[in-house]
């Protein structure tokens, strides 16, 4: 909410008023909270000029209003060293006002504070453990003696004395809310100490605890706070204030939290209806429950009614078969906008399925405003992380910005889970010094605990966004090193997938949207799926793997819905890589499949086409397809804009085979005299999978030999127990003999005829797309550049021209 951000937005003359309500208003009595110099619970320090502006004198009692409608009374003192618009207060006052350093509080004069007759003060239980003796003499008497301290009912204050500090809470004051403790005030401190849990629970959420929904928050505050606080605004213009807000968004994005924050901050009466709770078995009972809720809210106006999970009580009437549901929907409709107007009652609904709500509810006058609480972007995630980690003990080097970059598609709840997981990880590391049986844990162990970057990284590895829970996404642990050869393919892939995710601003600079799809084709066993796995691992995007045949189901129209759902999930957790393995099973040419399940395959393909390049806005969703029958794939899929990069993954040449041997045997113990080069030379025409198989087989022989040796040695030891074990086996390793043995069984999985087919296909693609090989801009010198083009087939281009003449 800084002013710089606002000014940078308004460069282009027109100011964006959508978040105007969130800006801080400038006023003389709004002061910025600063750390106190001398620690006193009843004193705040102001600059003399500020005091003059507010017409305060030294020693005046003032009323300070903080967040969540908290206020307190203190004595104002002048302090030359305090900056101009700041106010210095210590931690106790800050916690009573629920503010942190740098927040804004408002200061008001409070001339009519009476001397108190009686005050009732109780200690908080965990601060007096193990204390004996009279609390009053030790703590309260020296604190209040001759001090004339103002007190506010409900405040806490901390008293230091005798090596201890005890926290007290003001339970009652007489007279009224505020009073000054004078020498003749009676102080009661009898009674059960206040429990810390009851104390903490009151401290509920405010606007500060909701992150990543700044624009939506502004809309909600316009609709809720303005009518509740200043109804005359709407009266003077002559419109009725809006009555209903529907919040929708994926689970865990903070819909209920926002409603709670609004209730706490506005001070309105808050009535929460959980959808299923109002149902009852008696006829007419459920409707009367609803009516009672609305009556209750009108009695306590201004008030907010919050209906959580509204889709459970207001489903579409034509779809539901129960009589009760229909009656409840009708009752809700009449209550929200019936003949009786409802005054000062705002209805908020929350759901994650806005389309299953009865459409009559979604018109103006009932739920006027539908606010989409979506998945937060990077800035929003940083805000949310800041909120969740503000009470955590973080190590210095924790880089929240980095984490917010790595958590694409996480909603608020996922980020909270991430923080908890990181903290748990920190505790697990300290498990060796903790003992569960002990009653207490050493203070130094507790103090040494801090959550570091590594903990967050481990937590990131185990967590995934909740939008992807059911299509569970295992990021495979395959890296580029596991793939032998294919250097230019790797580069092409990195450009396609990693550039738009890592430096997206480059694409904006050049004014192009990045390409969205890649199709690998080539003989089986050349590493198409492996490449996709590596891409998922290397780039920071989420990864959904879709097996082609899984999408088809027996129900009519279900297969298309599956495709749609997958794309929706991918969009929610963008940037995301969708990998379709065996693409030819669902993308065969249309019209070729006659009569299978009413042409289900064709319909799935049509759905795929519209999803990939339809009219809906694109998020960063990449599509990688892999197939070994590229000739039967529908040509509409292969046009630029859908799968525009067609990458032929050939059988590996000698260098690549050498790389594959190396990659396979990275972790195996090899004997010195194995020559991988020679192996690579001999395996002409083998695919990557065949090469891997050779390695596995050699490995198997080595293991067999090793086990036989062990058995042999065991036998000898039993026959001759006295002999020393002088013949310790050399390190077990794979020897050339094993490879020679395994080469006897090696076989090629791809025949020459197949390869010719693939090459012919690649060739036709090259020609069909290669019209522009001869193209040069007019002014470049011709000869030098023409030679540089590898595909310069001038005669082929000339032949092609005959087709069009």
Swiss-Prot record:
Residues 783-805 are annotated as: Disordered. Keywords: ATP-binding, Cell cycle, Nucleotide-binding, Repeat. GO terms for molecular function: ATP binding; ATP hydrolysis activity. ATP binds at residues 249-256, 522-529. PROSITE patterns: AAA. InterPro entries: AAA+_ATPase (IPR003593), AAA_ATPase_CDC48 (IPR005938), AAA_ATPase_domain (IPR050168), AAA_lid_3 (IPR041569), Asp_de-COase-like_dom_sf (IPR009010), ATPase_AAA_core (IPR003959), ATPase_AAA_CS (IPR003960), Cdc48_dom2 (IPR004201). The keyword Cell cycle applies. It comes from the Eukaryota. CDD domains: RecA-like_CDC48_r1-like, RecA-like_CDC48_r2-like. Disulfide bonds: none annotated. Transmembrane segments: none annotated. Belongs to the AAA ATPase family. Probably functions in cell division and growth processes. PANTHER family: AAA-FAMILY ATPASE (PTHR23077), CELL DIVISION CYCLE PROTEIN 48 HOMOLOG (PTHR23077:SF165). NCBIfam families: CDC48. This is Cell division cycle protein 48 homolog. It comes from Capsicum annuum (Capsicum pepper).
